[in-house]
Design a protein with these regions (language model features):
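Short glycine- and hydrophobic/aromatic-rich loop-to-beta-strand nucleating segment
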Residues: 133-141
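A glycosyltransferase accessory/donor-loop signature
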Residues: 1-24, 35, 41, 49-58, ...
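Active-site-proximal specificity loops/subdomain of glycosyltransferases
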Residues: 44-90
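Short aromatic/hydrophobic "clamp" motif used to bind/position activated sugar donors
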Residues: 94
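Surface-exposed amphipathic alpha-helices with a cationic face
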Residues: 26-30
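Catalytic metal- and UDP-sugar-binding loop of GT-A-like glycosyltransferases, i.e.
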Residues: 97
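Conserved donor-nucleotide/metal-binding helix-loop-beta segment in metal-dependent transferases, i.e.
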Residues: 101-130
Length: 247
């Protein structure tokens, strides 16, 4: 059994996602996580967020002027600013959640599963790469992730496409990476939507034993709900169970 101190951490920046994504994530967590916990959102705009959500500014990546931050921002989840006095002062186990996921089962086991650093094993790659929609670590560990990234920015950008590739490569080299059980976190596109031609008449379903459905790329939950796939070549029928869970 893991220690009782638990934190859900999420991030919202820019204009791609509105405050309703964070508010709905907060509501889903309250329904599905029964152990004592904090819900913390790092954001550049608190407008529209529920008052009972703890909000803090996003720590700076501290990149050189002109260097693009897109694709790397989540690395600040390892910033010492998140555990230092005057900030969120995070303690214990931290579970990072992307704000565009849909929770469909109990979350308690994400804090009970043993491991130093746990992440989804990416569904498309056959190597160590993780999908960082859901990952857990202990507050204050792995400050070297951000330190190494800042000190070796160009080399990291040339070698890795985004933060999840770099993150899992860096921690795999230390032997710290474990993966969630395969059935817990499923891809909407790969595991819920039926293969063509069955997708033309069969509604996407929640996979057996799934706890979280991940919406990576397109469609997002509100689009999938009404049957908009976001891609001309991918047919997605309206998916009622999203409305039942994404609230």
């Amino acid at each position: 059994m893991r220690p009782s101190m638990a934190t859900i951490l999420c991030m919202k920046w820019g204009t791609k996602y509105g405050p309703e994504y964070v508010n709905r994530l907060h509501s889903m967590v309250r329904r599905h996580l029964t152990i004592p916990h904090r819900f913390v959102c790092l954001t550049d705009n608190r407008t529209g967020l529920n008052e009972d959500i703890e909000t803090f500014s996003i720590p700076s990546l501290e990149l050189p002027a002109g260097a693009p931050e897109r694709g790397w921002t989540k690395l600040v989840s390892f910033s010492p600013a998140l555990t230092a006095p005057g900030g969120p002062e995070l303690k214990g186990d931290i579970l990072f959640l992307d704000i565009d996921i849909v929770i469909v089962g109990s979350m308690n086991s994400f804090f009970e599963q043993p491991g130093d650093f746990l992440i989804i094993r990416d569904w498309q790659k056959g190597d160590y790469t993780g999908n960082s929609s859901v990952y857990r670590w202990r507050a204050g560990t792995y400050p070297d992730v951000l330190e190494y990234f800042r000190a070796n920015l160009e080399a990291v950008r040339q070698r890795h496409r985004n933060e999840q590739e770099f993150l899992t490569a860096h921690l795999s080299a230390q032997g710290k990476v474990s993966y969630w059980p395969e059935t817990w976190c499923r891809s909407f596109k790969r595991h819920c939507v039926k293969y063509f031609p069955f997708s033309l008449w069969q509604t996407p379903e929640i996979p057996d034993a799934a706890k979280i459905v991940v919406f990576h790329g397109l469609p997002n939950p509100p689009d999938a709900l009404v049957g908009r796939s976001g891609k001309w070549y991918r047919r997605v029928l309206p998916t009622p169970w999203i409305a039942e869970n994404w609230k």
